[in-house]
């Protein structure tokens, strides 16, 4: 690197207002990728991102590409891809983020328009501000400045900005297959996670896997009068509620035979911090056993995330013949999601009350992830994060899942996969009033520029 650290920080600081303005422009595009929303917004977002990638001057060609969804004749949402090949002996770095966002949800809960960015108390509020449009701008802003801190750009660079991550990446596997050579890299940087807090950067080293499915419980062939038959005939919700109670121990830990735990090192973190960050009510206790971070990072969890039953306003005095639920299982690193799902299936078959009929549908599996932090790229990104923030970096687990990472690992088994991001505990990704800590965003650009400069000097 020909520039000093102070030069790097000054360059980023000088250009940061433009980066922030570009981020605001992206947030204004309601690029929700769910099938019930207007796909033209996602297409508009892809065009806007292609334009800012072109402005870096790093690439000769920037493309907007689509692939067919798995098991479908329908194309997925548009992705933005650009590639610059490396000089001989130099590594290629793939920079991933996604430009689609979650639906805004209940607008009445938002304190401002979700698609009109608002700065307040050092944060930028808006849907996608943190997840994941700031990740896009961290990549682009660092690339735009790279030529100012190295003599020649010798490393290879791939920019891959997906357009359907929030909808489960239905065309992702086909996309990797269709464009394998275009995307091939030695290092893959996934900017879709977060930091320990606004003062402490983190490298995400583990992610739980997931197994989600629809479960239907049937006890009757039609609804029955609750006075005429209640007390003698079980309804479907009664059976379902009894089943759910068997998922947990008295402490709230998952007690499903065959679901595994793993061992992980955890940084210092208290139950009080968890209470404060989660917003749990004062009267409510935390659940589970072991260190609170082990419960999130290295133990399984199971949650009913949706339920199809009559709403209170329209409920009649009947026994329900059928109940359907969406169930989410988080899988500890080290266990395959398929094995975890089979364990849950076996538990349900064994413990469903009253001999009720159960049907499984819409099963989606995503693998857990763990990375080797001894690789040269992991060491380089840790060093860059530490320099940018001026403090030690936390190796952090995340209780959530990023299922497409396992697709990256399968498609490019020799690549080092690094998971970074700009979120923090107050970002509220996927929730109303999502926000980005603006100073952390600037630090992320500094860190990425330092990392790319180090990669540029690396010989394979």
Predicted regions and their residues:
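Acidic/histidine-rich catalytic neighborhood of metal-dependent amide-processing enzymes
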Residues: 124, 130-206, 460
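A short beta-alpha structural unit
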Residues: 329-332, 358-374, 398
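Zn-dependent metallopeptidase/amidohydrolase metal-coordination segment
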Residues: 216-218, 240, 307, 319-323, ...
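Acidic/His- and Gly-rich active-site-bordering loop/insert found
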Residues: 2-127, 146-155, 327
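Acidic-enriched catalytic cores of C-N bond-cleaving enzymes acting on peptides and small amides
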Residues: 226-307, 335-357
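Short, solvent-exposed beta-strand/turn "edge" segments of beta-rich domains on protein surfaces
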Residues: 232-233, 314-321
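Acidic, glycine-rich active-site loops and adjacent beta-strand->loop/helix elements
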Residues: 99-101, 160-168, 191-196, 219-221, ...
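Short pre-catalytic strand/loop immediately N-terminal to key active-site residues, enriched for Gly-Thr
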Residues: 120-131, 391-395
């Amino acid at each position: 690197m020909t520039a000093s650290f102070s030069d790097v920080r000054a360059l980023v600081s000088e250009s940061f207002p433009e980066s922030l303005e570009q981020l605001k422009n992206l947030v204004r595009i309601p690029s929700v990728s769910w099938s019930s929303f207007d796909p033209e917004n996602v297409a508009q977002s892809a065009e806007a991102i292609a334009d800012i990638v072109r402005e870096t001057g790093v690439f000769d060609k920037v493309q907007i590409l689509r692939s067919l969804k798995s098991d479908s004749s329908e194309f997925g949402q548009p992705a933005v891809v650009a590639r610059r090949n490396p000089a001989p002996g130099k590594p290629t770095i793939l920079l991933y983020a996604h430009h689609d966002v979650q639906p805004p949800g209940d607008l009445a809960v938002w304190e401002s328009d979700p698609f009109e960015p608002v700065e307040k108390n050092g944060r930028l509020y808006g849907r996608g501000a943190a997840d994941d449009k700031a990740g896009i701008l961290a990549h682009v802003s660092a690339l735009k400045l790279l030529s100012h801190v190295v003599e020649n750009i010798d490393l290879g660079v791939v920019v891959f900005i997906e357009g359907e991550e929030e909808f489960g990446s239905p065309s992702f596997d086909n996309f990797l297959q269709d464009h394998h050579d275009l995307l091939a890299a030695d290092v893959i940087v996934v900017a879709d996670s977060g930091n320990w807090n606004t003062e402490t950067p983190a490298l995400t080293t583990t992610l739980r896997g997931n197994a989600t499915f629809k479960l239907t419980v049937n006890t009757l062939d039609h609804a029955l009068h609750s006075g005429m038959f209640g007390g003698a005939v079980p309804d479907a919700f009664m059976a379902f509620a009894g089943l759910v109670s068997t998922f947990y121990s008295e402490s709230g830990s998952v007690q499903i035979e065959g679901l595994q735990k793993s061992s992980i090192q955890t940084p210092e973190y208290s139950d009080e911090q968890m209470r404060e960050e989660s917003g749990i009510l004062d009267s409510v206790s935390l659940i589970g056993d072991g260190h609170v971070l082990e419960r999130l990072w290295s133990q399984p969890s199971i949650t009913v995330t949706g339920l199809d039953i009559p709403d209170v306003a329209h409920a009649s005095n009947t026994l329900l013949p059928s109940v359907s639920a969406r169930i989410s299982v988080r899988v500890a690193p080290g266990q395959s999601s398929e094995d975890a799902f089979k364990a849950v299936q076996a538990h349900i078959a064994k413990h469903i009350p009253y001999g009720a009929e159960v049907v499984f549908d819409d099963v989606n599996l995503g693998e857990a992830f763990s990375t080797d932090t001894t690789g040269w790229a992991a060491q380089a990104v840790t060093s860059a994060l530490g320099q940018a923030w001026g403090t030690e970096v936390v190796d952090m687990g995340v209780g959530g899942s990023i299922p497409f990472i396992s697709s990256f690992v399968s498609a490019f088994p020799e690549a080092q996969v690094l998971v970074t991001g700009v979120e923090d505990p107050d970002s509220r990704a996927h929730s109303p009033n999502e926000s980005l800590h603006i100073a952390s965003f600037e630090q992320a650009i500094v860190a990425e520029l330092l990392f790319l400069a180090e990669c540029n000097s690396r010989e394979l």
